[in-house]
Amino acid sequence: MADHPLYFISCGPGDPDLITVGGLRAIEQSIALLAPKVYEEGFSAYLSGKEVESPFTMDHQTVVDWVDSRLKRGPVAFLLPGDFSTFSPFHSFVEHFFDRAVVIPGVSAHAAAAALLKRSWDIAGVAHTAIITSPRAITRDGRVSLREYGGEGNTLILYMLNLPIGELVTELLHAYTPETPIAILENIACPGERVTLGTLDDIEARLDGRDPFGVGSTSSEPTLALVVVGGALVSGEKPDMWDYRYEKLWKPREMK
């Protein structure tokens, strides 16, 4: 029996145009795939004729058994939201199938968010640090709180939100002023894409009762929402920064 590969394909935010050529090639080779429901529409042209299921309707052992049974017949793939490197819940499956796992990198959700908003997360004189984290990851044992990661000069990028918007804002106000910009991006580059911009002072009102994080949802499918907080959302870089870099960094190299 051939040792068929198990692909873990980082699919970016959900737009097929943002997946790598290697990722598309792996999809074409796979006989069966585990994918979020939202990807079934966006990637429908590549999934036609293939067996597709959502992994979020199964426990860990059921997923393992599902994959094992299909690997006997051919290559199998997971379609991963964003990039495997950042807050991916699929790491335990890579560990389980380690020798057969092929991980294919992709575009992270926060990179796609920066492109959508036409902003960089680090801006000279405004934001010197970009911090990527999740309330689910840092509050599990209660020793570290979200407020410890924010603050002036930091762009805070939040994955896997599990807090009502009111609680999130209250926590962030311990680190930022009420005037601090915030963006909530839902389903980036997927059907239902939506961007809500505001400040910590008014973002809850701008949502008008909507729950972008699915806190009260009964669906097994995860919500694809990202939150970005900080001055980099509204500040551009001044042209003199280019000239500074030219004079101090690039021009001296040309003169050598």
Mark where each language-model region is.
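Short, glycine-/small-residue-rich phosphate/pyrophosphate-handling segment
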Residues: 114-141
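A contiguous loop/helix-start segment that scaffolds small-molecule binding in enzyme catalytic cores
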Residues: 2-8, 73-76, 85, 89-94, ...
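Short, hinge-like loop/turn segments at secondary-structure boundaries
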Residues: 51-53, 119-124, 175, 199-202
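Class I S-adenosyl-L-methionine
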Residues: 1-104, 111-112, 204, 220, ...
